[in-house]
Amino acid sequence: MNGLDDENQIDERDHYTDDGDYEIDIDSMNMFKSLYYEMMAYFSDLQMHLGEHLMAIDWDMKCKSIAEPVGNCLTALFYIIRLLQDTLLSNYKDVYVSTEAFDLSKSTTLQEFPFLIRFVEVSKTKNLQNAKYIKKKTFMFYFDKLLLFLMILILSTNAYISWTFIWRNFKTYSLLYVVDRPNSKNVTKCSRTDLDQSYMENVSYGSYWTMLSYYIRNFRKKDDLEDEITTVKQKTPNVNEKDYYYQLKKWSPSKFLTSLFCSFSPTCLVFLILSDVSFTTSIAVILHQFIFKYVVFEGYESRINDESIIHSAMISEINQKFVEPRLSKKVQDAKIDATPEGKVYRTEFFPSLTNCKSNLFNRHDLKGRSITESYNDRIKEFEIVTNTNNETHNVIKVVKK
């Protein structure tokens, strides 16, 4: 005993100083800190590596190999769960329901009459059988809870996918050089100077809830609201003088998410929840899956691809007919000696630096005066341009009726 006490005293001396203060092992603390930092760095590096790997995958190319099979499997699993709930578990609940509320053996009124004793005996036998079935219902009870848990999990997954597909996939484009407002409800008017400024024009194109919330927030600013309404009606003819621009919020879900949403549609799940599922219900589910796939991918997605092909063909036609002929003109600068000395006129050609040439030509007469001429394509001759130094005036003549 004395030896053990001495060892404990030695251990206590190792942790306490001569002044009675507790001594901390610095090496062990540094080891734990380094281990903690290494673990945190490992998890952060692992998260970064997984994020980069997922971002590098082209998910649109995997819509048929991953998204569509996963969505169909989840829909089929939900159908099987609802089928088991409406066929197997519904009969189980009806047969093995507790009958203690209808226990006639506990009635004192029936026991007073001899001719009613047989009903009491029948009730006792049923209660005994029910008690035996309660012991055997453990597996079916937990199986019911498991199906309910899977059903809630699938519904939560579908709600998250639907929310992401409908409200989380938007791209914003700033239309800086558009003068008139485009005819779209996704276009909003934004200020170039004040980011918090809102326009009445955006509210008029919004929903009723947007209008109501705007009027509630600006209830005390009626004067500013009226001034804003008057400024909205005025259109600025010059684009550079505008203090606002239009912003387009385009809904653009990815092809992978669209395929997952169509194969795992919330309408199919709601239909299975609200209806009595049987084996014939599978026909409606299969038709729903095929119709959604045909309408969205075979119809609408193909239409978008065909429109992009038509637009690219139109752009190619414009480039070949108008843009390339103007940009690929082979032109040269020419200098002609038009002096009357001698009968031989000298002409020099120089490489052109630009493809854009002016129709005005400057020459000098015999007295050294500068003359400006323009080539008239109609008569195929040069004409002298007069009054070239005068300022131009934009005059609009209105004929009175």
Curated annotation (Swiss-Prot):
Domain of life: Eukaryota
Membrane recorded as keyword: yes
Spans traversing the lipid bilayer: 146-166, 256-274
Predominant cellular place of this UniProt entry's protein: nucleus
Keyword Transmembrane helix: yes
GO cellular component: nuclear membrane
A Pfam family assignment: DUF2418
GO annotation (BP), single: maintenance of rDNA
Membrane-topology annotation of the record: Multi-pass membrane protein
Compartments (UniProt record): Nucleus membrane
InterPro entries assigned: Nur1/Mug154
Keyword terms: Membrane, Nucleus, Transmembrane, Transmembrane helix
Family of the protein in this entry: Belongs to the NUR1 family.
UniProt-listed PANTHER family: NUCLEAR RIM PROTEIN 1 (PTHR28293:SF1)
Record's function text: Member of a perinuclear network that controls recombination at multiple loci to maintain genome stability. Required for rDNA repeat stability.
Protein name in UniProt: Nuclear rim protein 1
Source organism of this protein record: Vanderwaltozyma polyspora (strain ATCC 22028 / DSM 70294 / BCRC 21397 / CBS 2163 / NBRC 10782 / NRRL Y-8283 / UCD 57-17) (Kluyveromyces polysporus)
Taxonomic classification: Eukaryota, Fungi, Dikarya, Ascomycota, Saccharomycotina
